[in-house]
Amino acid sequence: MAHRLIYQVVVTGTQVFAKAFTQAYKQAATAQAASKTSKSAASKFGGLQLDEACKILDVDETALDKVVAELNKKHKLEDIAESESVLAQIDKKFTHLYTVNSEHKSGSFYLQSKVYRAMERIRGELELDPLPKPEIEEPKKKEEEKK
């Protein structure tokens, strides 16, 4: 009788351990697959994650997700108008940060590159056209001012 009880305890313990092990393995496999896809997307867009790009351009990530959803639906006109206003705000922030950090205004090329890559990442997420570099007014040279 005692050997039957010990046998049941061992079998039940083995079953519980096996189920826990398989669940942990499945979770680890899905987490690894998800990290590979996010890393490949980040490497495609200059090494930036989407949340990092949103922080650089000071964009609310939930608003960006809403824009992505609306661009995928394209049903209601007011939603499209709202999405376009969010895109216009993002573009305005980009052009401001890009021009402020230009080398002609004693800005940082590194920061300018970060801003450009952040916008490139957001446009890639929204599947928009490639990003053209904004034109920056070059300061007049001293020779031209003397004339």
UniProtKB/Swiss-Prot annotation:
Annotated GO CC locations: PAM complex, Tim23 associated import motor; TIM23 mitochondrial import inner membrane translocase complex
Keywords per UniProt: Membrane, Mitochondrion, Mitochondrion inner membrane, Protein transport, Translocation, Transport
Region J-like, residue ranges: 52-127
InterPro entries: J_dom_sf, Tim16
Compartmental location: Mitochondrion inner membrane
Pfam family, one: Pam16
Membrane topology term: Peripheral membrane protein
GO biological process: protein import into mitochondrial matrix
Start and end residues of each stretch annotated as Disordered: 128-147
Gene Ontology molecular functions: protein domain specific binding
Domain notes: The J-like region, although related to the J domain does not stimulate ATPase activity of mtHSP70. It nevertheless mediates the heterodimerization with the J domain of PAM18 and is therefore essential for PAM complex function.
Complex formation: Heterodimer with PAM18. Component of the PAM complex, at least composed of mtHsp70, MGE1, TIM44, PAM16, PAM17 and PAM18.
Known function: Essential component of the PAM complex, a complex required for the translocation of transit peptide-containing proteins from the inner membrane into the mitochondrial matrix in an ATP-dependent manner. In the complex, it is required to regulate activity of mtHSP70 (SSC1) via its interaction with PAM18/TIM14. May act by positioning PAM18/TIM14 in juxtaposition to mtHSP70 at the translocon to maximize ATPase stimulation.
Family named by the database record: Belongs to the TIM16/PAM16 family.
Protein name: Mitochondrial import inner membrane translocase subunit TIM16
